[in-house]
């Protein structure tokens, strides 16, 4: 890691860089590898029928093309190719649902999300923190194992954060909730991963909120400004990549004193309150992780969770505001469950949260109706692969499944274009009560992925979103300004997020 930073900060002679660049260009011309899509001629390529296949068109109208491809190919069990405007060097293949079972159990050595991330977001050039086995273990095992103990701390952070960012008046006041939600989710995950010391650092919270946009912007600019054979130069020369390095370095400086306190046996957390830094220190045994390693783990989890959780929370809130009668019914459920659990000091437990069946069903239906991502289970083929039915995919092919189309397929969900707030509650009552909840994954609900590679943090996200909504619905009257309803989502490539700039009216209930 030290060598990494020395290299990042070195000041090479322009002449040396020029010579190396020319050498790379010559080598690229002489030994040009076979393009990945050369081995995909057996899979149809879908384009816009009107002939406008510009990059801007693909980014703007992705859902329309996915829908056309779903009706023509994937619903009939056939894959198709789409142009990959974000990563032209790697073709993307949209797969039908029949391949879900094989992909769900495929090892990382065959189909890799990490490789997909490196290709799609240029992680090797932007210096963005990467997923590691430690990160996955920390979230999938330690966080889920300690969920009960983490909820009290999470609720405390949510209450403090929302109270500081939302209006606190007896009169109706306008606000744009998104940044309050991003700040809140960042504080909550910081408390879980680093205790009070980390969640109390405003610099860290701001860094954790901003690093996602920083890394994505760096990757986009590098892709636009550097051809593939010259991208190695961007690691040292591109301002965005250098800004990511500076952020990572500063994050290590913030984390290091916390680590030293833990090693000295002192910490500013309640007895019995576990957190990610403790888990990392315990997991390393005799090998002590560096502050940079710990900070990178923390930043990666923030990149993976802060904005997705915030956008999902905002989307559910918008859907509730469009259905005030349903919202009142859910508030009634919240109050009834809270009354049954008054003996826990006003704090929500796992058991109490699990009894909020109407809220959970509404969240699941909102997640189906307005998914924040149009696709799921993105992977890159690590090796040439042949599926059981004979479908061949060459190495480095990117694959994905069209979540948005599964969600709106009448053969999967009856009356798919109707928002039914109790859809999933009725499914639980009619079948297995342990299925069909918000964090549940199946071949019909793949928003969180599937199988052994399903999102490991989905259970925490479910509890966190519930705690956020409980606080907002019970502490505030909330409504749209007169005459307004949920604005259209912002669709960009495979992203389908709620409008972050919409104004909502808040009034503090406790003071009104």
Curated annotation (Swiss-Prot):
Its cofactor is heme. The keyword Thylakoid does not apply. Pathway: Secondary metabolite biosynthesis. Keywords: Glycoprotein, Iron, Membrane, Metal-binding, Monooxygenase, Oxidoreductase, Transmembrane, Transmembrane helix. GO terms for molecular function: actin binding; heme binding; iron ion binding; monooxygenase activity; oxidoreductase activity, acting on paired donors, with incorporation or reduction of molecular oxygen. Disruption phenotype: Impairs the production of chaetoglobosin A but leads to the accumulation of cytoglobosin D and chaetoglobosin J. Glycans are attached at residues 53, 124, 168, 499, 508. This is Cytochrome P450 monooxygenase cheE. CDD domains: CYP503A1-like. Cytochrome P450 monooxygenase; part of the gene cluster that mediates the biosynthesis of chaetoglobosin A which has a unique inhibitory activity against actin polymerization in mammalian cells. Chaetoglobosin A and its intermediates are involved in the morphological differentiation of C.globosum. The first step of the pathway is the synthesis of prochaetoglobosin I via condensation of one acetyl-CoA, 8 malonyl-CoA, and a L-tryptophan molecule by the PKS-NRPS hybrid synthetase cheA, followed by reduction of backbone double bond to install desired geometry by the enoyl reductase cheB. The chain crosses the membrane at residues 5-27. GO terms for biological process: actin cytoskeleton organization; secondary metabolic process. Induction: Expression is positively regulated by the cluster-specific transcription factor cheR that binds directly to an asymmetric direct repeat present in the promoter. Pfam families: p450 (PF00067). Belongs to the cytochrome P450 family. Heme binds at residue 455. Its main location: membrane. It is an enzyme of class 1 (oxidoreductase).
